[in-house]
């Protein structure tokens, strides 16, 4: 989905599958500059973005900010074998070539992407996490691994934090379980918010939430900045969220297409001043 100055821009296709794209004649143009928001759904939208930016460059002189809350291709932030294609690198090269005034990304999964993007501004999720803490009335924050602890540990004010350590089958990468690291006694009878950057099927959070509930937590909720719709296919949503064992999942509007019961959106609002 591509939105400019708060208005969704629709695209169609000709019978041969090529792009049909016309801007609304009553589209509002901002004298200070234009904000394009790309809510990533597929790489096909990249061509629409290219065409839109080229059209603006040809027809007017204006600043253009790109808000790309979820930065795609972060999973491919390195190559290990000769025939691996470094998709993140080439994606960032295309964005750089469009010469946006600035590119705003929200809580990117990989720091490699930040090094590859020009004129990039990283929007931290601290205010979003605080809002999720307020909504959930959480007393304690749980980080599902040390990476999340290092990433978000300074964003939780004075709340008590606990973290987990995953146990994996290193041959397959599959999570076998996890251990709650001391002070696990703080969990009993408390309201807890799990905090991390992204969820796919939610396997990590399935094990984390179960461990917290086993330790006597009174309430468990989850905050992730980015959430894929595949969360609805996993045990975490179907066994824990739908049954009420996990109270809520809080996420931003960056990626999730369908909001089902148990999911709440925490809105990230971009503006030119913060970029």
Protein language model annotation of sequence segments:
Residues 1-275:
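PRPP-associated nucleotide enzymes
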């Amino acid at each position: 989905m591509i939105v400019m100055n708060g208005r969704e821009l629709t695209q169609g296709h000709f019978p041969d599958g090529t792009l049909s794209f016309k801007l609304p004649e009553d589209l509002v143009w901002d004298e200070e500059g234009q904000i394009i928001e790309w809510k990533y759904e597929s790489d096909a939208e990249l061509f629409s973005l290219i065409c839109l930016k080229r059209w603006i460059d040809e027809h007017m002189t204006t600043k253009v900010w790109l808000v790309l809350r979820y930065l795609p291709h972060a999973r491919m932030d390195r190559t290990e074998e000769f025939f691996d294609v470094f998709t993140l690198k080439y994606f960032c090269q295309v964005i750089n070539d469009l010469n946006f005034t600035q590119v705003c990304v929200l809580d990117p999964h990989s720091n490699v992407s930040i090094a590859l993007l020009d004129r990039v501004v990283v929007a931290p999720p601290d205010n979003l996490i605080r809002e999720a803490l307020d909504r959930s009335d959480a007393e304690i924050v749980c980080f599902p691994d040390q990476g999340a602890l290092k990433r978000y540990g300074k964003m939780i004010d004075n709340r008590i934090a606990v973290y987990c350590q995953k146990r994996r089958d290193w041959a397959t990468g599959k999570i076998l379980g996890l251990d709650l690291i001391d002070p696990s006694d703080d969990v009993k009878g408390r309201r807890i918010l799990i905090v991390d950057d992204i969820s796919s099927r939610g396997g990590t959070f399935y094990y984390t939430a179960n461990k917290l509930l086993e330790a006597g937590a009174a309430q468990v909720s989850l905050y992730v900045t980015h959430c894929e719709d595949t969360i609805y296919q996993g045990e975490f949503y179907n066994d824990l969220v739908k049954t009420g064992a996990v109270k809520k999942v809080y996420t931003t509007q960056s990626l999730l297409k369908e909001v089902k019961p148990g999911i709440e959106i925490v809105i990230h609002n971009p503006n030119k001043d913060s970029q």
